[in-house]
């Protein structure tokens, strides 16, 4: 059964992508970061999210693969993305389809 966790900026699936399709997997997690392009991402910041994801997944090694645990990982990644925004490592995409400033109003500097 396909398990998933979806937050505003993070989607995690127990699946792998093949031919633009999600194929269920018990061995692979797929991470989709900021699917609505709410933020401007530099490669360094995006790699930090991937590294944090790997770290969080490793911390659950040996535990049940459940929607609850996936939600915990997704929630932790949401907080991590907020910290990147607060540190100025990412910024809001002012050309995004919707501007809702879900992580707080932008800082004018």
Swiss-Prot record:
One of its GO terms (molecular function) is quinone binding. It is found in: Cellular thylakoid membrane. Keywords: Membrane, NAD, NADP, Plastoquinone, Quinone, Thylakoid, Translocase, Transport. Its EC number is 7.1.1.-. It catalyses: a plastoquinone + NADH + (n+1) H(+)(in) = a plastoquinol + NAD(+) + n H(+)(out); a plastoquinone + NADPH + (n+1) H(+)(in) = a plastoquinol + NADP(+) + n H(+)(out). It is a peripheral membrane protein. The keyword Transferase does not apply. InterPro entries: NdhM. Pfam families: NdhM (PF10664). One of its GO terms (cellular component) is plasma membrane-derived thylakoid membrane. It is an enzyme of class 7 (translocase). The keyword Translocase applies. NDH-1 shuttles electrons from an unknown electron donor, via FMN and iron-sulfur (Fe-S) centers, to quinones in the respiratory and/or the photosynthetic chain. The immediate electron acceptor for the enzyme in this species is believed to be plastoquinone. Couples the redox reaction to proton translocation, and thus conserves the redox energy in a proton gradient. Cyanobacterial NDH-1 also plays a role in inorganic carbon-concentration. Belongs to the complex I NdhM subunit family. HAMAP family: NDH1_NDH1M (MF_01352). NDH-1 can be composed of about 15 different subunits; different subcomplexes with different compositions have been identified which probably have different functions. This is NAD(P)H-quinone oxidoreductase subunit M. It comes from Microcystis aeruginosa (strain NIES-843 / IAM M-2473). The gene is ndhM.
């Amino acid at each position: 059964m396909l398990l998933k966790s979806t937050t505003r900026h993070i989607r995690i699936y127990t699946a792998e992508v093949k031919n633009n399709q999600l194929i269920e997997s018990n061995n692979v997690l797929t991470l989709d970061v900021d699917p609505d392009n709410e933020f401007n991402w530099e490669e360094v910041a995006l790699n930090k999210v991937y590294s944090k994801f790997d770290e969080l997944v490793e911390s659950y090694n040996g535990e049940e693969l459940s929607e609850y645990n996936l939600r915990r990982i997704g929630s932790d990644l949401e907080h991590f993305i907020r910290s990147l925004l607060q540190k100025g490592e990412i910024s809001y995409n002012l050309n995004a389809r919707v501007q809702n400033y879900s992580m707080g109003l932008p800082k004018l500097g």
